[in-house]
C-alpha cells in the first residue's frame, strides 16, 4: 500500500488509538495522530518511517481543527471518549457533538471510510449520561456519514488499561478489596483485538454502515474479575461488598478528587451488564479471534506482586519494544 494514502486517528495517543496507529503505519499509511496534546503523541513517531506518523493538534470540539485533520484523508478513525466529565456537559460535547462533527466534516472532505469507537450499552435513552451521549454520538455519526462502521467494545484490557491496573494497585495498598455491583457481567476484550477489528472494518466492504459489538471469549462477573486480579498479584485480601447507598456517598466525594476515580454516573453504568448482545455481529464476523484475559493480563500484573516493584512495566509503546521480553504480548 502506498505511503501517500492518509489515515487520521482522533485520539491516536490514547489507550486504544495507539494500537490502531501502529497497525495503520505498518500497512504503509501516513498517519495523522489528531490529539489535543501533540507533545504527548511524540512516542508514536518511531512506529513508522520518518514523517509517516504525524502528531496533529486537533480537538473534536473545534470545527477548524477537525476540518484540518480530515482534509485529504482517505480513512478516519474516531477513538475519542472520556469516562468522567471535568465540567458539566463534557459528555455531550465530546461523545455526541464531537462525534457528529467528525462525521460531518469527514463526509464533506470526501473521506472513503470512517470507523467510530463507541461502547456496549450506548443508547440515547440510557440512565447514564456516558451511555446516553455515546448513543447520541452514534446517531449523529449515522446521520452525517451513512457508511460509518461503529464498533462497541465491552471493557477493554491491555498493558495500559484502567481497570486491571487500578485495582491491582489498590490491592497492593489496601487490606480489603471493595466490591460494588459484584454481580454485574462484563465481557473483556483485548485492545489488540479492537485494533484488529478497526483494520478489518476499514478494508471490508460489508462493514460499511454496520455496527459490531466486541467482546472476549468469556463473560465475567465483576467480583470474578476482582478475585482474578488478587490471584494474579498474589494478594490475599478480603472482598467486601459495598451497599449501593454507601457507594453513592463515596462517589459523591470522589467526584471532587482530581482524576475522579469514581462518579455517580459510573455507578449507574455498573448496574447494567456490559456484554455482547446475542446474535449481534462481533469480532468473529470481522475475522478476529478473541484473546482471553488469561493470556495477556498476567503479563502486566506481575509488577504488582510482592517484590514485583523492581519489574518493569510492559512498554507503553505497543511496537513491542521492552527491556524485559517476558512481558511482551502478541502485540
Give the role of each language-model region.
Residues 2-30:
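N-terminal Rossmann NAD(P)H-binding glycine-rich loop of SDR-like oxidoreductase domains
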Residues 10, 34, 79-80, 114-120, ...:
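SDR active-site strand-loop-helix element
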Residues 17-19, 96, 135:
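Residues forming the Rossmann-fold NAD(P)(H) cofactor-binding site
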Residues 38-101, 105-108, 120-124:
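NAD(P)H-binding glycine-rich loop region in Rossmannoid oxidoreductase-like domains
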Residues 43, 166-191, 231, 236-277:
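Alpha-helical membrane-targeting segments
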Residues 101, 162-163, 181-203, 210-213:
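Substrate-positioning beta->alpha
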Residues 118, 138-162, 169:
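Conserved beta-loop-beta element that borders a ligand/cofactor-binding pocket
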Residues 200-263, 277-331:
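Mid/C-terminal beta-alpha module of Rossmann-like enzyme folds, strongest
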